[in-house]
Amino acid sequence: FKLSWLAPTAFYLEVGGELLRGNHFPSAGAANGQGAWTLFSKIGGDMGISTSWQAGVSYLSTDVVGRPSNTSSGEFYGDSDLFGFDFVIKWAPLGNPRQRNFKLQGEYFSRDEKGVFDGSEYRGDQYGWYLQGIYQFRTGWQFGYRYDRLKADNTGVTDTELDPMGRDLYRNS
């Protein structure tokens, strides 16, 4: 079930929420058909004739019932909450992106999990972000750069088979 409202304003403003089964990651088990819910808001607009922007915030709360691990036979039971912020800025000469355009976008997220994994208390905090820019300099030709980073502080599972290294990952691409 999704409910959203697009405000009748001179700029873009949408707010909404969803009730979900919660059968897929980061949730699991569908919690009797009501395992997850979201809230979101997006705002955006034009900056002159060639540039537009949009930013948003979102929140996802899930009840996790028996989510399996990828690396062991244990399962997680508890709560998983995810907060996110995203933005995008687009530029195209005179608003026409066919020949040339540039897009800069990024996102930040933070996830907090509390519960029980394989009979032991578990608390996991993960956060990550990415920033990327893509420039199309000619029809069919573009180049870009992306940097992303992920940090996981999974108290209770660090140095176990679930998280053997206490990960802090990054990538350039």
Predicted regions span which residues?
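Aromatic- and glycine-enriched pocket-lining scaffold segments that form the walls
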Residues: 1-64
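Outer-membrane beta-barrel pore domains
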Residues: 49-173
